[in-house]
């Protein structure tokens, strides 16, 4: 993949979700899990989404079960959990791998664009990548970075 907009992961129903439809938007990509100590970040992520969605901002959640088996459910169960417990309205796509031999092309691309502490691999759930309106990865945040602490960076690219 040579560009963010060439990517087309699957949505929770198994249909393509072409990133070409995101051209001109600011995108926050997050690998998520329902049974993680960071799971309450869904609330903050949804607050960010509600605050900025009308200004061309979108969050994409990518469930992943690679860290402590903290996302064991089906795509439908995950979507229901997010909506019921955190009122999530931003897209939560199909479960993927973010590391290893079967890494999803989305994360292969993101990690190649922005390393963290000199490493490409994702260390845990709820790492975040901020992508500007031109499809460039401009920032990567660790799991401990709370969504509300990303506001200045988001504002700067909206």
Curated annotation (Swiss-Prot):
Chief location category: cytoplasm
GO BP, one annotated term: hydrogen peroxide catabolic process
Subunit composition and interactions: Monomer.
Superkingdom in the source lineage: Eukaryota
Induction cue: By oxidative, osmo- and heat stress.
Function comment: Glutathione peroxidase-like protein that protects cells during oxidative stress. Has peroxidase activity reducing hydrogen peroxide, alkyl and phospholipid hydroperoxides using preferentially thioredoxin as a reducing power. May act as a scavenger of H(2)O(2).
Family (UniProt): Belongs to the glutathione peroxidase family.
GO molecular-function terms, A-Z: thioredoxin peroxidase activity; thioredoxin-dependent peroxiredoxin activity
Disulfide-bond pairs as recorded: 36-82
Keyword Nucleus: no
Enzyme class: oxidoreductase
GO cellular component, one term: cytosol
SUPFAM superfamilies per UniProt: Thioredoxin-like
Species per Swiss-Prot/TrEMBL record: Schizosaccharomyces pombe (strain 972 / ATCC 24843) (Fission yeast)
Cellular localization per UniProt: Cytoplasm; Mitochondrion
Substrates-to-products reaction catalysed: a hydroperoxide + [thioredoxin]-dithiol = an alcohol + [thioredoxin]-disulfide + H2O
Active site: 36 (cysteine sulfenic acid (-soh) intermediate)
Note: The active site is a conserved redox-active cysteine residue, the peroxidatic cysteine (C(P)), which makes the nucleophilic attack on the peroxide substrate. The peroxide oxidizes the C(P)-SH to cysteine sulfenic acid (C(P)-SOH), which then reacts with another cysteine residue, the resolving cysteine (C(R)), to form a disulfide bridge. The disulfide is subsequently reduced by an appropriate electron donor to complete the catalytic cycle. In this atypical 2-Cys peroxiredoxin, C(R) is present in the same subunit to form an intramolecular disulfide.
Record-given protein name: Glutathione peroxidase-like peroxiredoxin gpx1
């Amino acid at each position: 993949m040579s560009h963010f907009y060439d990517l087309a992961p699957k949505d929770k129903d198994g249909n393509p979700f072409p990133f070409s439809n995101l051209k001109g938007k600011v995108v926050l990509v997050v690998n998520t899990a329902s049974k993680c100590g960071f799971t309450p970040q869904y609330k903050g992520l949804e607050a960010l989404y509600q605050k900025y969605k009308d200004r061309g901002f979108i969050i994409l959640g990518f469930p992943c079960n690679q860290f402590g088996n903290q996302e064991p459910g089906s795509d439908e169960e995950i979507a229901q959990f997010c909506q019921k417990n955190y009122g999530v309205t931003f897209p939560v796509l199909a479960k993927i791998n973010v590391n290893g031999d079967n890494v999803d092309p989305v994360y292969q691309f993101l990690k190649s664009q922005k390393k963290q502490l000199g490493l490409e691999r994702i260390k845990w759930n709820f790492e975040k990548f901020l992508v500007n309106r031109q499809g460039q990865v401009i920032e990567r945040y660790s799991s401990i970075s709370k969504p509300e602490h990303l506001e200045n960076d988001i504002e700067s690219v909206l």
